[in-house]
């Protein structure tokens, strides 16, 4: 289950974003985005396709330049050049070293990040990659490609992990397994920002939500806080999203 709001309230704010705006010519993709993220929480960026979730992740990661933005990490300015020190971004559809076997790719990243063999073995088991270690990356299904990238992300040392649609390509049982991996990751101290369009998945795994529509924030809070705001005491995230957008 997601962390309780009382636990979140006592965790320090690690990332603060204010006045984030991104334009493509005359089109405003993101308008005056503001959000905070606390240590050890799972924050969900929620919205339909085209809401601005991926663009927001790419701006936060420094992949795309913002037209305006102020980012702070633990109270200190976080310019694009420093973001790779504190965050790791897992975009949708990435397949590293396409012609290499999965085991070799994982061993490479474990070496880069100086992770012991036992640590790598635990991650491989946790994300369910054992059956495909001998396969080449290009031959993996979408679900196993996701598992591979999640394993790479878990090997990295950065305290903040950004993921775009982490459950895409999984069935219900597999989704629950990966949710468990992410929740254990957060419980161990890492902070996660997940872009999710499946609201039921988000409701199950995220501690707080940023509701996006047309590049604007329409609501921020825990499920209980959003229920209070919308006067929907038993409302689902879907009902709340519809009420606010």
What is each stretch, according to the model?
Residues 61:
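Helix-to-loop junction immediately C-terminal to a conserved catalytic motif
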